[in-house]
UniProtKB/Swiss-Prot annotation:
GO BP annotation list: cell morphogenesis; cuticle pattern formation; regulation of cutin biosynthetic process; trichome branching
GO terms of molecular function: DNA binding
Broad class of where this protein is predominantly found: nucleus
Domain HTH myb-type intervals: 9-61, 62-116
Gene: MYB106
Subcellular location as annotated: Nucleus
Keyword DNA damage attributed: no
Name of protein: Transcription factor MYB106
PANTHER family: MYB FAMILY TRANSCRIPTION FACTOR, TRANSCRIPTION FACTOR MYB106
Length: 345
C-alpha cells in the first residue's frame, strides 16, 4: 500500500497563504533548494503539507513567473489551444512561457469563456450556436440523401449485372444450337458428297404424268403403266407432307405366295439413301432384285389372277416368261446407258 497523504496529518494549516508563510518558503528555497517537498515544511518551519508548498512555489512564488495582464496574442493562443486540446491546462501552459497552468485556467474561466458566449460562440466546440443547431438537422438530411443515392446506385448495378448474365446465356445458347446443327448435318453431307448424282428428286404433285426417277436410270414410269401392276402412285399417297426434304422412299416388297402382290412400301429416307449412295457396286443387280426378286413366278394383282384362274399351266408359264423378258429388256437399257455411268463416278 502507498503512503498516506501528508495533508491528512493533524495540526496542519489549510486555506490561503499569508505573506509571512510566503517569506519563509522563499528564504528556505533560495538557501537550500526545494529538495523533497514532503520533508520541506518541517525544515522551513511551516505548518503546511508538502503539496501545498509545491503548488505555492510553482504557481505564485517562482521568480520567473510572468505577472500582469494577458496580451492579445496570449489570449488568441489560449483560445486556439483550447479548441485543440480542451481543458489540458498544463499542455497549454507549455506554449506560454512564464505563465502557469493555474493562471491560464483562471483567466479562461473569468474572461475568455464569457467573451465567447457573448459573441454567440460555443466555448466547448468553438462554433456558432446557429451552426451547431443546423448541423444536427443538416447531417440528418445529408445522410438521407446519401442513403437514397446509394440505393439507386446499387439497383442500377444489379440491373446491369442481370442484363449481362442474360446476354451471356443467350449467346451461349445460340452457339450451342449452331454446333448441334453442324454436327447433325455433317454425316449427311459426308455421305452425299461421295455420289452426288444419285440424289432423288421429289416428283411434282398434281400433274397427270408423274415421273419416278431412279438414281441410276433415266427410265420414265408413267401412271398408266404403274396402275395395272398394282403399284400405288403419288396421287394416292399423303398430300399433306410439305417437308422440303424427301420424307419417304419407295421399296418393292415381293411375297412368296402364288397370289402375292407387288407393292411399294415407304421406308425411312436414310436407309434407302445409305443403300444407294454408300453401297459398293452391284447397283444394277440391286435394282433387278427389287423389281424382279429371286423367284421366277411373279403374280399380277388379285384381279388379274382371278381372270386367268382357268388358264392351264402352259399358258401361265408363257406369260411369266414374257413378263421376265420385258423386265430384262428394261434392265439392259439401264445397264447400257452411258450418261448415268458417267455421272456416277
Amino acid at each position: 500500500m502507498g503512503r498516506s497523504p501528508c495533508c491528512d496529518k493533524a495540526g496542519l494549516k489549510k486555506g490561503p497563504w499569508t505573506p509571512e508563510e510566503d517569506q519563509k518558503l522563499l528564504a528556505y528555497i533560495e538557501e537550500h533548494g526545494h529538495g523533497s517537498w514532503r520533508s520541506l515544511p518541517e525544515k522551513a518551519g511551516l505548518q503546511r503539507c508538502g503539496k501545498s508548498c509545491r503548488l505555492r512555489w510553482t504557481n505564485y512564488l517562482r521568480p520567473d513567473i510572468k505577472r500582469g495582464k494577458f496580451t492579445v496574442q496570449e489570449e488568441q493562443t489560449i483560445i486556439q489551444l483550447h479548441a485543440l486540446l480542451g481543458n489540458r491546462w498544463s499542455a497549454i501552459a507549455t506554449h506560454l512561457p512564464k505563465r502557469t497552468d493555474n493562471e491560464i485556467k483562471n483567466y479562461w474561466n473569468t474572461h475568455l469563456k464569457k467573451r465567447l458566449i457573448k459573441m454567440g460562440i460555443d466555448p466547448v466546440t468553438h462554433k456558432h450556436k446557429n451552426e451547431t443547431l443546423s448541423s444536427s438537422t443538416g447531417q440528418s438530411k445529408n445522410a438521407a440523401t446519401l442513403s437514397h443515392m446509394a440505393q439507386w446506385e446499387s439497383a442500377r448495378l444489379e440491373a446491369e449485372a442481370r442484363l449481362a448474365r442474360e446476354s451471356k446465356l443467350l449467346h451461349l445458347q445460340h452457339y450451342q444450337n449452331n454446333n448441334n446443327l453442324n454436327k447433325s448435318a455433317a454425316p449427311q453431307q459426308h455421305c452425299f458428297t461421295q455420289k452426288t448424282s444419285t440424289n432423288w428428286t421429289k416428283p411434282n404433285q398434281g400433274n397427270g404424268d408423274q415421273q419416278l426417277e431412279s438414281p441410276t436410270s433415266t427410265v420414265t414410269f408413267s401412271e398408266n403403266l404403274l396402275m395395272p401392276l398394282g403399284i400405288p402412285t403419288d396421287s394416292s399417297r399423303n398430300r399433306n407432307n410439305n417437308n422440303n426434304e424427301s420424307s419417304a422412299m419407295i421399296e418393292l416388297a415381293v411375297s412368296s405366295s402364288t397370289s402375292s402382290d407387288v407393292s411399294l412400301v415407304k421406308e425411312h429416307e436414310h436407309d434407302w439413301i445409305r443403300q444407294i449412295n454408300c453401297g459398293s457396286g452391284g447397283i444394277g443387280e440391286g435394282f433387278t432384285s427389287l423389281l424382279i426378286g429371286d423367284s421366277v413366278g411373279r403374280g399380277l394383282p388379285t384381279g388379274k389372277n382371278e381372270a386367268t384362274a382357268g388358264v392351264g399351266n402352259e399358258s401361265e408359264y408363257n406369260y411369266y416368261e414374257d413378263n421376265k423378258n420385258y423386265w430384262n429388256s428394261i434392265l439392259n437399257l439401264v445397264d447400257s446407258s452411258p450418261s448415268d455411268s458417267a455421272t456416277m463416278f
